[in-house]
């Protein structure tokens, strides 16, 4: 059970840092 919780927590936390550079590039393009 702890393995499943940590794995799901990793999946939830992973997209945030991964998408941060892309959103930054999009903001620079808009400006």
Swiss-Prot record:
Disulphide-bonded residues: none
Protein's membrane topology: Single-pass membrane protein
Example GO biological process: photosynthesis
GO terms for cellular component: chloroplast thylakoid membrane; cytochrome b6f complex
Matching InterPro entries: Cyt_b6/f_cplx_su6
Subcellular location field: Plastid, Chloroplast thylakoid membrane
Spans traversing the lipid bilayer: 7-25
Gene Ontology MF terms: electron transporter, transferring electrons within cytochrome b6/f complex of photosystem II activity
Family that this chain belongs to: Belongs to the PetL family.
Record protein name field: Cytochrome b6-f complex subunit 6
Organism: Huperzia lucidula
Lineage, top ranks: Eukaryota, Viridiplantae, Streptophyta, Embryophyta, Tracheophyta
